[in-house]
């Protein structure tokens, strides 16, 4: 699908995990104008107050929209998606896409009807997630692990750091002996970035399911017939709320997402 005029799409997360969703969308829609914003000044969202998450997400999206008129926003963060979508939709007239743990497809794929959900602590405790399980995995045994450490490991990897498999195995150790566990939901957008390492720790699992491809298809559908707000040729950019520690981290992120430049947003 090619666009003669580029729709501008913003992907937003507290960290770099949302780049996994961005990559899936860019692969499907290579000719759009892409912006990526991450609130590293308040990272991680998983254990933060809901009101603070809502306020910061809205403020950052509005600030980017002032300079780069947006046609669609993807909240590429499972934790934020459980709380911010209603407020964003009240303040924007453009499509807003959230990220939902892929519990339904995992339950459908599972042959043993024994599935696992790895997510942040914030996502795990949301009523919304329990409702998804009740509606779509009521016939399955569902295990849950809420982990901030896995998010930090994924961040380190994308910035050029090493993944400590021993730490990863420790986080996932409750599932090590569950032989019937055959499907795992990667319920945080960071986790596809360390999927290979997670697979090594859970060799009995046949299916690892994330939301990236489904979100990309949803974005493609919503862009049909959209009236693009800004019709100039644009560069793909990334935004953060706090300077990164070193130039290597900046370059790793720019290269991974094929972005032209990184912009630091001031409060």
UniProtKB/Swiss-Prot annotation:
The active site is at 77 (proton donor/acceptor), 188 (proton donor/acceptor). GO terms for molecular function: glutamate racemase activity. One of its GO terms (biological process) is peptidoglycan biosynthetic process. Pfam families: Asp_Glu_race. It catalyses: L-glutamate = D-glutamate. Its EC number is 5.1.1.3. Substrate binds at residues 13-14, 45-46, 78-79, 189-190. Signal peptide: none annotated. InterPro entries: Asp/Glu/hydantoin_racemase, Asp/Glu_race, Asp/Glu_racemase_AS_1, Asp/Glu_racemase_AS_2, Glu_race. Keywords: Cell shape, Cell wall biogenesis/degradation, Isomerase, Peptidoglycan synthesis. Pathway: Cell wall biogenesis; peptidoglycan biosynthesis. Belongs to the aspartate/glutamate racemases family. Provides the (R)-glutamate required for cell wall biosynthesis. This is Glutamate racemase. The gene is murI.
């Amino acid at each position: 699908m090619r666009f003669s005029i580029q729709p501008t799409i913003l992907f937003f997360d507290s960290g770099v995990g949302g780049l996994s969703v961005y990559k899936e969308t860019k692969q499907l829609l290579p000719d759009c104008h892409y912006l990526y914003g991450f609130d590293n000044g308040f990272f991680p969202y998983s254990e933060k107050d809901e009101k603070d998450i809502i306020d910061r997400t809205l403020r950052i999206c509005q600030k980017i929209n002032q300079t780069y008129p947006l046609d669609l926003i993807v909240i590429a963060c499972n934790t934020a998606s459980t709380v911010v979508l209603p407020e964003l939709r009240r303040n924007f007239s453009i499509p807003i896409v959230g990220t939902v743990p892929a519990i339904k497809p995992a339950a459908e794929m599972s042959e043993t009807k024994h599935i696992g959900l790895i997510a942040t602590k914030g996502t795990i405790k949301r009523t919304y997630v329990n409702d998804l399980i009740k509606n779509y995995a009521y016939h399955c045994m569902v295990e849950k692990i809420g982990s901030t450490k896995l998010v930090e490991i994924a961040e380190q990897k994308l910035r050029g750091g090493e993944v400590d498999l021993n730490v990863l195995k420790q986080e996932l150790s409750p599932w090590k002996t569950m032989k019937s566990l055959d499907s795992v939901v990667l319920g945080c957008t960071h986790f596809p970035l360390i999927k290979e390492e997670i697979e090594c720790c859970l060799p009995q699992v046949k299916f690892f399911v994330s939301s990236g491809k489904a979100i990309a298809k949803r974005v493609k559908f919503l862009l049909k017939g959209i009236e693009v707000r800004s019709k100039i040729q644009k560069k793909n950019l990334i935004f953060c709320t706090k300077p990164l520690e070193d130039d290597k981290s900046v370059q790793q992120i720019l290269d991974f997402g094929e972005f032209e430049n990184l912009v630091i947003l001031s409060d």
